[in-house]
Amino acid sequence: MDSADPQLNRFLQQLQAETQRQKFTEQVHTLTGRCWDVCFADYRPPSKMDGKTQTCIQNCVNRMIDASNFMVEHLSKMNGGHV
């Protein structure tokens, strides 16, 4: 980047941050699809969830939260503390 044009630098940083947000959103959608595939293997949820399915969903959501927190922390470090 050309340090002589701070407005261009700011724009490029914002563009990079938005691209990273989009990638993160895509990853969340991918993980959601995977959780669905794992917890509802037959692609249709039962009329009433059993304990096994509830545990599966809970574990999957917890892993998604862990992944989300990791990604936010990683992006924050990459952006010098600004997400």
From Swiss-Prot:
Pfam families, per database record: zf-Tim10_DDP
High-level lineage: Eukaryota, Metazoa, Ecdysozoa, Nematoda, Chromadorea
Gene expressing this chain: ddp-1
UniProt organism field: Caenorhabditis elegans
Keywords tagged on the record: Chaperone, Disulfide bond, Membrane, Metal-binding, Mitochondrion, Mitochondrion inner membrane, Protein transport, Translocation, Transport, Zinc
Membrane topology label: Peripheral membrane protein
Name of the protein described by the UniProt record: Mitochondrial import inner membrane translocase subunit Tim8
Job of this protein: Mitochondrial intermembrane chaperone that participates in the import and insertion of some multi-pass transmembrane proteins into the mitochondrial inner membrane. Also required for the transfer of beta-barrel precursors from the TOM complex to the sorting and assembly machinery (SAM complex) of the outer membrane. Acts as a chaperone-like protein that protects the hydrophobic precursors from aggregation and guide them through the mitochondrial intermembrane space.
Motif (Twin CX3C motif): 35-60
Record's subunit section: Heterohexamer; composed of 3 copies of ddp-1/tim-8 and 3 copies of tin-13/tim-13, named soluble 70 kDa complex. Associates with the TIM22 complex, whose core is composed of tim-22.
Record text about domains: The twin CX3C motif contains 4 conserved Cys residues that form 2 disulfide bonds in the mitochondrial intermembrane space. However, during the transit of ddp-1/tim-8 from cytoplasm into mitochondrion, the Cys residues probably coordinate zinc, thereby preventing folding and allowing its transfer across mitochondrial outer membrane.
